[in-house]
């Protein structure tokens, strides 16, 4: 869960 554009973060860390 890293804010960069990973798998689950594509909805909140784009």
From Swiss-Prot:
How many and how are cofactors bound here? Binds 2 calcium ions per subunit. Binds 1 heme b (iron(II)-protoporphyrin IX) group per subunit.
List cellular component terms (GO).
extracellular region
One GO MF term: lactoperoxidase activity
Q: Where in the cell is it found?
A: Secreted
Give cofactor(s), names only: Ca(2+); heme b
Reactions accelerated catalytically: 2 a phenolic donor + H2O2 = 2 a phenolic radical donor + 2 H2O
Its GO biological process annotations read: hydrogen peroxide catabolic process
What is the uppermost EC class here?
Answer: oxidoreductase
Q: Which UniProt keywords apply?
A: Calcium, Heme, Hydrogen peroxide, Iron, Metal-binding, Oxidoreductase, Peroxidase, Secreted
EC numbers, comma separated = 1.11.1.7
Relate the protein's function as given in its record. Removal of H(2)O(2), oxidation of toxic reductants, biosynthesis and degradation of lignin, suberization, auxin catabolism, response to environmental stresses such as wounding, pathogen attack and oxidative stress. These functions might be dependent on each isozyme/isoform in each plant tissue.
UniProt family annotation: Belongs to the peroxidase family. Classical plant (class III) peroxidase subfamily.
Per its record, how is this protein called by name?
Peroxidase 5
What is the source species?
Betula pendula (European white birch)
């Amino acid at each position: 869960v890293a804010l960069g554009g990973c798998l689950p973060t594509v909805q909140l860390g784009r």
